[in-house]
Curated annotation (Swiss-Prot):
GO terms for molecular function: carboxymethylenebutenolidase activity. PANTHER family: ALPHA_BETA-HYDROLASES SUPERFAMILY PROTEIN (PTHR46623:SF6), CARBOXYMETHYLENEBUTENOLIDASE-RELATED (PTHR46623). This is Putative carboxymethylenebutenolidase. It comes from Salmonella typhimurium (strain LT2 / SGSC1412 / ATCC 700720). The keyword Transcription regulation does not apply. It catalyses: 2-(5-oxo-2,5-dihydrofuran-2-ylidene)acetate + H2O = 4-oxohex-2-enedioate + H(+). Belongs to the dienelactone hydrolase family. Its EC number is 3.1.1.45. The active site is at 147, 204, 236. Keywords: Hydrolase.
Amino acid sequence: MTTTHPSGFAPAASPLAPTMIHTPDGAISAGITSIPSQGDDMPAYYARPKASDGALPVVIVVQEIFGVHEHIRDICRRLALEGYLAIAPELYFREGDPNDFADIPTLLSGLVAKVPDSQVLADLDHVASWASRNGGDAHRLMITGFCWGGRITWLYAAHNPQLKAAVAWYGKLVGDTSLNSPKHPVDIATDLNAPVLGLYGGQDTSIPQESVETMRQALRAANAKAEIVVYPDAGHAFNADYRPGYHEASAKDGWQRMLEWFAQYGGKKG
């Protein structure tokens, strides 16, 4: 795993805010595992409830640009307390370690841009397969992702026909294409296999509201089962409780909407 920094967070995520949340793990089992994927062993963090009856609904948690650091691991723990098997794969592991980058611009150019979407989507397929062999219900597969992972969440909803529900937090919707990123969410609006909930900040300078409206129009034109919620007072990464831009009210509302979305479409065990 990349979470070797003493704080548990990638250096580029600094400065850390005092609002960070740590979920107690007394009622859950959590740890690091290795998932075979495309000839490699992919590190991943998982969390599940200690007490469970039968196979668990599965949520794949897709990292921010900072990798599977403490915030993403805590997201997994929170989902485990809600009755899910949550898995966060380390999707940069072939290309490098986020802890080797001191700031966001060099992290983006030196690592994130080198990771092909096609590789990521295939890795997520192997995560789903691993979950089905390790106590997860293959018929109740869901995904959520944040920032970089929010964009991937949209793409995966168009990639895997077995997916039941997806929730994308402030993921990029439009942009320039490249060999590693040939499509963006706006390009796959007609191909969604599962209902997608998008959660966005009205003050997000990295995702202009014009791009959110463009995505809404594409979804309407495709008659897609999707919804986009914009929080007017929130900026980018408003759920990242370890960062200064954390917006508690929006984060809490988004979390509740995510759980309701999963319960409605994902077949969560009651």
